[in-house]
A protein has these predicted regions:
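Active-site-proximal helix/loop segments of hydrolytic enzymes
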Residues: 1-142
Length: 142
């Protein structure tokens, strides 16, 4: 999860795909959209426009958040884990640990299972496979 400064009311899900102009941008953006839609479906509020944003580091080491609607190619680097990879990559922050409502919704065992299911289904959708039904205590959940 993410954290915010004391007194902040920040909450919700956001994720960062590889930025425009990078080799894996399109694939990363597609996967980020799958994650955001899945998290919204289980009740997460989405930060920004649709929960998908880009982040850049400026010359003075300050971060700049940019909505995913801004698709111009920029020279600034993003997170290293999104830059120095040989595959699609997305950094996801599914909640704010400093927000009581986020923690209540996603900090429990049930919330973690819901989130894990979203990630699993997004991975299956990305690869074009059908997810297996979830098995819990002898019951099948879809």
């Amino acid at each position: 999860g993410n954290s915010a400064a004391n007194g902040s009311t920040a909450s919700g899900f956001e994720c960062y795909p590889a930025v425009p102009g990078r080799t894996w941008h399109q694939e990363s953006f597609y996967f980020a959209q799958l994650l955001a839609k899945g998290m919204q479906a289980v009740g997460a509020s989405l930060r920004g426009r649709g929960g998908v944003r880009y982040i850049y580091y400026l010359e003075n080491d300050q971060k700049q958040l940019v909505e995913s609607t801004h698709t111009e190619v920029r020279a600034e680097r993003s997170f290293t884990l999104l830059e120095d990879v040989n595959c699609p990559a997305v950094l996801a922050e599914q909640c704010f640990v400093t927000n009581e409502a986020d923690v209540a919704q996603f900090g429990s065992e049930e919330g973690c299972k819901k989130t894990a299911r979203v990630y699993y289904e997004a991975i299956c959708a990305y690869f074009g496979t059908q997810p297996q039904a979830e098995q819990l205590a002898g019951f099948t959940l879809n």
